Amino acid sequence: MIVYNVTCNVAPEIEKRWLEWIDHQLYNLSKSEKISATSILKLNTNSSENEAVYALQYQIYNRDSLQSFLNNEDQVLKKQINTVFGKSVLHFSSQLQNIKKYP
């Protein structure tokens, strides 16, 4: 299982609107046969700034599914984020491999 993570730094003034928007987008993406699960996580920060940092996580079955996801759904979603929110949402991606899961 591969975990694909997109970390998003969201400007405070658009956080509520972005969260509603991304929730709808991920709900639709979660129906993909490439993805076994999706999650929206919020990072707990001790920062005095009102920054909001979220992690969008996708559990993807295998490398082929990941590559297809990266070439299609991921590019579309990131383009939409940039179009709708511009520089109010900054994001970067990382890939993690699940080595072992404990009960």
Segments predicted by a language model, with ranges:
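Intrinsically disordered, low-complexity regions enriched in Ser/Pro/Gly/Gln/His and often acidic
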Residues: 11-14, 95
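Short, well-ordered beta-strand segments in beta-rich or mixed alpha/beta enzyme
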Residues: 2-9, 41-72
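An amphipathic, aromatic/His-enriched active-site/gating alpha helix that lines ligand/cofactor pockets
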Residues: 32-36, 59-94
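Short amphipathic alpha-helical segments
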Residues: 14-40, 76-79
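Generic alpha-helical hydrophobic packing signal
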Residues: 23, 57-60, 96, 101
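Residue-level signal for secondary-structure boundary sites
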Residues: 14, 64-66, 102
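Glycine-rich beta-strand-turn "strand-cap" elements at beta-sheet edges
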Residues: 39-49, 80-103
